[in-house]
């Protein structure tokens, strides 16, 4: 499949995994050595940089518990070289851009979330 088809499939599955609130399904997309940057992480765990799959599981597990009505609506996606950006709206109506970098096996090794005001 071409990069655009792969990016579209990833974006749709990623949003579906979040909307299912399935932490294992969400984390299956990420490499063990993931580095994740998010202003929300800074609020929830005191650090905007989350390193490693265990730390990411702990953070997102806590975040899911804090947001029982969490729901993402996919707006669009952009494909790049071993990278993509997912643009979505969260359950609070806030727009979020999640940019990810993939390794050669298609796992996310670096991700950053940027939020609209």
Where are these regions (language model features)?
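A beta-strand edge to alpha-helix "cap/lid" segment located at domain peripheries
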Residues: 1, 44, 57-117
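Short, low-complexity N-terminal intrinsically disordered segments enriched in polar/charged residues
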Residues: 1-28
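Generic alpha-helical structural signal
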Residues: 8, 12, 54-61
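Short, solvent-exposed secondary-structure junction/capping segments
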Residues: 12-16, 30-44
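Hydrophobic pocket/interface hotspot
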Residues: 14, 26-27, 34, 52, ...
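Short, hydrophobic secondary-structure boundary micro-motifs
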Residues: 27, 37-38, 72-73
């Amino acid at each position: 499949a071409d990069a655009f088809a792969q990016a579209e499939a990833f974006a749709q599955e990623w949003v579906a995994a979040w909307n299912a609130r399935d932490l294992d399904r969400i984390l299956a997309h990420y490499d063990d050595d993931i580095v994740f940057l998010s202003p929300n992480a800074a609020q929830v765990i005191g650090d905007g940089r989350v390193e490693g799959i265990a730390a990411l599981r702990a953070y997102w597990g806590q975040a899911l518990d804090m947001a029982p009505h969490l729901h993402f609506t996919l707006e669009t996606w952009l494909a790049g070289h071993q990278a993509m950006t997912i643009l979505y709206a969260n359950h609070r109506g806030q727009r979020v851009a999640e940019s990810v970098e993939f390794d050669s096996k298609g796992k996310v090794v670096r991700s950053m979330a940027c939020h609209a005001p």
